[in-house]
Amino acid sequence: MKCLLCGQTMKAVLTFSSLLLLKNDASCLCLDCDSTFERIGEENCPNCMKTDLSMKCQDCQLWCKEGVEVSHRAIFIYNQAMKDFFSRYKFDGDFLLRKVFASVLSEELKKYKEYQFVVIPLSPERLLERGFNQVEGLVEAAGFAYLDLLEKREERASSSKSRSERLETEFPFFIKSGVTIPKKILLIDDIYTYWNNYKSCEEAVGRSGC
């Protein structure tokens, strides 16, 4: 088996549990590539998981003053290795890389069995340009289904906006017609920037009368 990132050949290691449960425990990454990704430690904002903090960050404090309680969970720090991964996966279209974090994401999503998963959508134009929704690929590779609940209108890319423009933008998400909205929803996205993105999805659900 070869590492999905660097192509290095890896030796398959069979464990007792994999033989007993007919489960494939093989990693998609070699040890060198795996070590470049950094897990979020215990020192972080309790609301958004911004790292190197022991208390609520300034952004979350501002949201709290507006009556909004940020509730976000993340697994990895967005370091250079993660930036390179998403550059290849999202922008170069290497769809095979959706499997890289499948086992990690699977273990994390198992904690939310009582929730219905909803993926943050791309606009039709962005989906046509990219060819796939990168978050849907990650969730499917982890072995989970999700609700096709939201749609998004086209807008200027977030990467071309200043921080103030991002915070002021009203993200154009809306609920698809004819769908049933569950009581407990877990919104899933790839990269956390600001809470606006998720807040606008919550508002879309609220506007639907649920």
What are these regions (language model features)?
Residues M1-C210:
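Glycine-rich phosphate/pyrophosphate-handling loop used in enzymes and phosphotransfer proteins
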